[in-house]
Amino acid sequence: MVKKSDIYVLSGLLVHEGDWSYRSFADRLHVPHPVVQRGLSRAQDADLYSAEQREVHLPHFEEFAIHALRFVAPAQLGALMPGVPAAWAAEPMASAIRSSGAEPPPVWPYARGQVRGQAIEPLHPAAPEAVEEWPEFGELLALLDSLRAGDPRVRRVAEDLLVSLLSEWAGERKR
């Protein structure tokens, strides 16, 4: 059974460029290396990852993210607290969705966060720290959070952006 932390690991792998070891990749994600090893093992069992090619199966990841993620890893908006903008409050969703500003933005709770908003649990507690150093990773996680917690309109926009992004990455892999 795929866990939220496994999707976090796969998402990082999608964005990561170049060679990696379990330990170096875990450091980049701000998680212990067994989280990466176990996550990729479960992802391989679910046909989301190929250990032989050391890459995420893009069509399977896309299908899982769009159709299953919100059921496997649902997210609810919670209490007001400081944090890092998440879901539709973070790029690329923030540019694609116009907010009325009446509702507080979704945030990942984070002591050093600069935005006060409604808490949303990230796919992994290390996400706020990891995206400070890795903005591209944060963009993918924002799309996934929008699929997990957004209303139908937000989910449609996130789906379109995710499909476009994954298609772009698939084209780059073929080169």
Regions found by a protein language model. Give the residues of each.
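Long, low-complexity, charge-rich intrinsically disordered regions
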Residues: 77-175
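Short alpha-helical segments that sit at the start of domains
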Residues: 1-12, 16
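A short, conserved structural fragment
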Residues: 44-55
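Helix-turn-helix DNA-binding helix
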Residues: 36-37
